[in-house]
Design a protein with these regions (language model features):
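Nucleotide-sugar donor-binding and catalytic loop/hinge architecture
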Residues: 1, 101-104, 133-136, 207-218
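Aromatic- and Gly/Pro-rich donor/ligand-binding loops
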Residues: 7-14, 18-165
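Catalytic donor nucleotide-activated moiety binding site of glycosyltransferases and closely related
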Residues: 140-148, 179-184, 223, 230-271
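A short beta-strand/loop micro-motif in the catalytic core of glycosyltransferases
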Residues: 170-177
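Donor nucleotide-activated moiety binding/catalytic core segment of transferases
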Residues: 192, 196-199, 204, 255-278
Length: 278
């Protein structure tokens, strides 16, 4: 079955890249032919919300001692082109509609990642509910996320009504966070199921080709939002193991130590190796 995957432009977000990779591999394993719809954004037209998001990430890295590496964009682009099946670049909503008509996808999957946050789509903000698809194309949302505890970026009641009507045409809708079930009902009037993120849905074998064993197995903590509770858990692990777990940004040399053979040329792959070598 020919399946299109419609998610946020991948930019340099390794989490977004990995979820797209994982979902495409799961679909291939089920015997389908997936293609990620290759949304391309002109830097001058990135949404204010997404620019703020990228700036916040950069500031967080700077404050934590991480250095900006201009090769990161090249590395992530290389990973995407080599490991995720892509369509031709799509630069405008008109191009998007034309591509889907040409490819004749039998199914288009919305997700994963924060696809229910339309401002993150920039020029494609009005497309997240897949209203551009022909009537005979099956629509599915998998592990979609609102990116928070409320709907952001839709203030016009008419726009909200139009997107709700589009989402009502979906054969199935699922969300990444438990709160998303309630938000989907309140915001769009649709029923949604709570499911695994694609990175956890896939078997570990899809990551094996990127991984190499480190000389030693050590503790590793990946904390999105540090809190007293998470710090207490880390301290407990420190007492049990006799050393503090490594954390991204907390220790500059963390990637080098965990990759076994030095820093991998592709930092996204380095991250995978870190998780594998625990």
């Amino acid at each position: 079955m020919k399946i299109g995957i419609f998610t946020l432009p991948l930019v340099n977000n390794y989490g977004g890249i990995l979820q797209a990779y994982a979902l495409s591999r799961v679909l291939v394993g089920l015997g389908h032919e997936p293609r990620l719809i290759n949304l391309r954004l002109q830097r001058s037209k990135l949404s204010i919300a997404y620019i703020k998001f990228l700036v916040a990430c950069a500031l967080k890295k700077e404050l934590c001692g991480a250095k900006f590496n201009p090769s990161y964009e090249r590395d992530t682009s290389e990973f995407v082109s080599e490991n995720i099946p892509l369509t031709a670049p799509v630069c405008t909503p008109a191009d998007l509609k034309a591509l889907c008509e040409k490819k004749r996808f039998e199914v288009v999957i919305l997700g994963s990642d924060q696809v229910f946050r339309p401002s993150y789509f920039a020029d494609f903000a009005d497309c997240f509910s897949l209203g551009f698809l022909p009537p005979n194309c099956t629509r599915i949302a998998y592990a979609a996320s609102f990116g928070g505890d409320r709907l952001c970026g839709l203030k016009n009641p008419a726009d909200l009504k139009a997107h709700a009507a589009n989402l009502a045409k979906f054969k199935a809708i699922s969300v990444r966070e438990r709160d998303g079930v309630k938000l989907a009902r309140e915001c769009f009037g649709v029923d949604a199921h709570w499911v695994l993120d694609p990175t956890l849905l896939a078997n570990k074998e899809i990551y094996d080709k990127f991984l190499s064993l480190a000389p030693q197995r050590k503790g590793f903590a990946y904390i999105l939002d540090p809190s007293p509770r998470s710090e207490a858990a880390i301290e407990l692990l420190k007492k049990q193991r006799g050393e503090r777990p490594r954390q991204p940004h907390r220790h500059k040399s963390m990637v080098k130590r965990y990759c076994g053979r030095g820093v991998c040329a592709n930092r996204l792959i380095s991250r995978l190796r870190i998780f594998h070598n625990l």
